[in-house]
């Protein structure tokens, strides 16, 4: 069984909606999913390692959402060893209005997680809020990402 923890950074609730849709689509599968808002966690969420999905919007001029900021800052300042962490990444942003800082919050998380030894599985999904329904695009991306996770981690799907 694959245990997946989705960590959500959101300013207006869209990233949380995306995480909820992913959780709904995985309901009834052999994947155990637990979703947590970054507002309510600290770096100890990574204790013991595992598979994580970072799902975050970008706020303002490329900023991490307000509620996720303490969590992000703790990673920057305490620099825990995350070599036993595997993760995927979904970034949400507005390419039309903020092209220069499109999905910067997700890119910031990707950078710090990599620096701390975590290993990203697959390519990130960067969703432009002007082109697609983020929850539908994320759910579609998730199908391929789960296959890649299982392959890289040597976990077979149960019937």
Predicted segments — roles?
Residues 2-5, 13-17, 25, 29, ...:
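FMN-binding flavodoxin-like domain, especially the glycine-rich phosphate-binding loop
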Residues 29-43:
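A short, well-structured beta->alpha microelement
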């Amino acid at each position: 069984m694959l245990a997946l923890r989705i960590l959500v950074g959101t300013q207006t609730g869209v990233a949380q909606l995306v995480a909820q849709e992913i959780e709904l689509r995985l309901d009834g599968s052999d994947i155990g999913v637990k979703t947590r808002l970054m507002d309510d966690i600290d770096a100890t969420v990574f204790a013991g390692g595992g598979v994580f999905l970072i799902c975050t919007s970008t706020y303002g001029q490329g900023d991490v959402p307000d509620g996720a900021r303490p969590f992000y800052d703790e990673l920057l300042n305490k620099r825990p060893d995350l070599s036993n962490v595997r993760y995927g990444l979904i970034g949400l942003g507005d390419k039309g209005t903020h092209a220069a800082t499109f999905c910067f919050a997700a890119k910031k998380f990707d950078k710090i997680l990599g620096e701390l030894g975590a290993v990203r599985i697959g390519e990130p999904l960067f969703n432009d809020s002007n082109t697609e329904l983020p929850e539908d695009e994320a759910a579609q991306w998730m199908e391929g990402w789960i296959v890649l996770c299982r392959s890289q981690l040597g976990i077979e799907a149960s019937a």
